């Protein structure tokens, strides 16, 4: 107890010097110790929690009347007859939203953004809320949470073609969001989660999927015009460059952690005399057999997943559980006795990557969240980017994403998966390969070609250059000369939300105009009842389009028009 008092004294001294970040870290470590040793908080500990703004961590059983009053003052309705005490920074963000402010927030993974969204819906009771998320998996996760709380009052929409009700909560990735641009008359608040995926971090594109980046910017821009209020979220951004999509929004970087991350730079202990892979395997065995709590293992590729899984199967590593036994039995029945995932599940190990069927990934995520479920999850970036899950321990097996080294921004996102508010005060990270150099990531947003082709340039006269507008109109007139006046824009509007590249659309129109008889023969081929014969009809078409695409790359004033996929 004397040691606790000394720690509290240190926290108090640092607090008086205004060193709040260090104060929070020391206090959070102390709270983890008290939890592990099953020691109740003293009034002094509660007082320091209050002073640092970590209000939800106050122990009611040992609190005084001032702390109990504060807990009630910061308690908000988050839907489903549930009230939650927000920490100081959550409360500040919620207050700004309730006041109608447009916010772009950069905050740690452990910030607790879901509570803010749910509290806003419960308190403001808006008619139409649109939440854009990066993946279908995250849309499913958000839908389940909102359905539990708001299904009695709202129509919760996650797919296309659903009839709207007087009050709607829309939750979907950008591709589906674009299908509702014309059917939603107005939006009370547009929420873009992980909006950094729409841009570039320090000049480097976040993802290679150019089409999805363009669609996200397009969804933000077109739906944003119908929104009374906007709320954008991202982690680890230090600066938001001036851009037309966040005009009028207040950018706020929130440096407020609710968990402490203890990083072990394991790679520094490697002797250099042994095989590096062998040393990594040795440390992985140590971590899995000695550390308590759930563990996420980040790897860079499917090949690395296989290598790590093979090593784990060699270990005397078991996690007996009736639910895992049942799941492993089902996997063997469905996929065969030798299916590696079934063997791993019996050991309490799961796998998450883009090649797995989505239902298998969802089952494993839910099992990882359960106390008697999976104890460890081996994952590529698919889990880091697409699902809100975390663990007490994170093992960073590789410093690459696929074959290229990831940047500091990605590294911080992986590290941010360790620890969880209310569950693990302290998260542990084991870095098995040298991380990238620390930087201060800034975000840039710009117009993609899909948006330039779809928008009415006259509506963006203050945001596009005169030359850009002139070239857009010239291209539109050229296409209309083949199709008829106004037909090209109608066609683009219909097809772009389905992910059709505007570049290929223009090339196909040109090809059809130049070789009408060839295209008539090709289209007739679709009437063939034997699908195998379709290939011969389309082989020549595909070759000509690819050839045209390579020759017709056009650059429109810093807006490159080029095909990303076909």
Question: At which residue positions do the language-model features occur?
Answer:
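N-terminal helicase ATP-binding lobe
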Residues: 1-566
């Amino acid at each position: 107890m004397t040691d606790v008092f000394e720690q509290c004294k240190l926290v108090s001294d640092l607090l008086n010097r205004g060193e709040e970040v260090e104060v929070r870290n020391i206090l959070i470590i102390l709270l983890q110790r008290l939890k592990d040793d099953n020691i109740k908080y003293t009034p002094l500990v509660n007082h320091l929690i209050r002073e640092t703004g970590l209000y939800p961590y106050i122990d009611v059983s040992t609190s005084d009347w001032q702390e109990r009053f504060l807990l009630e003052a910061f308690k908000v309705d988050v839907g489903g007859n549930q009230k939650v005490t927000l920490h100081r920074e959550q409360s500040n963000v919620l207050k700004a939203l309730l006041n109608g402010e447009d916010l772009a927030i950069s905050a740690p993974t452990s910030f607790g953004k879901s509570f803010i969204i749910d509290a806003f819906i419960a308190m403001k009771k808006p008619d139409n809320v649109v939440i854009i998320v990066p993946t279908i998996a995250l849309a499913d996760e958000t839908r389940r949470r909102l359905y539990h709380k708001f299904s009695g009052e709202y129509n919760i929409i996650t797919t296309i073609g659903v009839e709207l009700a007087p009050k709607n909560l829309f939750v979907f990735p950008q591709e589906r969001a674009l299908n509702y641009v014309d059917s939603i008359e107005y939006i009370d608040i547009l929420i873009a989660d992980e909006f950094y995926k729409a841009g570039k971090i320090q000049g480097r594109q976040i993802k290679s999927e150019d089409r999805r980046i363009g669609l996200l910017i397009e969804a933000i821009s077109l739906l944003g015009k119908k929104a009374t209020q906007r709320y954008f979220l991202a982690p680890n951004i230090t600066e938001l460059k001036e851009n037309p999509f966040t005009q009028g929004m207040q950018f706020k970087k929130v440096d407020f952690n609710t968990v402490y991350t203890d990083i072990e730079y394991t790679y520094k202990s490697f002797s250099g005399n042994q095989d590096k892979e062998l040393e990594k395997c040795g440390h992985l065995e140590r971590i899995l057999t000695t550390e308590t709590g759930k563990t996420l293992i980040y790897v860079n590729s499917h090949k690395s997943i296989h290598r790590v899984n093979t090593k784990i199967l060699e270990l005397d590593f078991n996690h007996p559980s009736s639910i895992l036994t049942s799941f492993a039995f089902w996997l063997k029945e469905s996929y065969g006795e030798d299916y590696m995932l079934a063997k791993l599940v019996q050991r309490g190990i799961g796998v998450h990557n883009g090649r797995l069927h989505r239902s298998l990934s969802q089952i494993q995520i839910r099992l990882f969240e359960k106390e008697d479920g999976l104890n460890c999850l081996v994952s590529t970036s698919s889990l880091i980017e697409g699902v809100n899950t975390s663990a007490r321990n994170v093992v960073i097996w590789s410093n690459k994403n696929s074959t290229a080294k990831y940047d500091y921004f990605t590294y911080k996102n992986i590290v941010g998966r360790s620890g969880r508010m209310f569950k693990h005060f302290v998260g542990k990270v084991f870095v098995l390969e040298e991380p990238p150099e620390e930087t201060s990531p800034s975000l840039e947003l710009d117009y993609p070609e899909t948006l330039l082709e779809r928008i009415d340039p006259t509506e963006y006269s203050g945001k596009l250059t005169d030359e850009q507008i002139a070239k857009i109109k010239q291209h539109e007139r050229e296409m209309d000369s083949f199709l008829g006046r106004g037909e090209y824009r109608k066609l683009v509007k219909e097809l772009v939300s389905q992910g059709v590249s505007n570049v290929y659309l223009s090339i196909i129109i040109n090809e059809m105009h130049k070789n009408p008889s060839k295209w008539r023969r090709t289209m007739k081929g679709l009437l063939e009842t034997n699908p195998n014969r379709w290939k011969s009809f389309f082989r020549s078409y595909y070759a000509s389009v690819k050839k045209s695409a390579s020759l017709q790359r056009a650059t429109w004033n810093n807006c490159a028009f080029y095909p990303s996929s076909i």
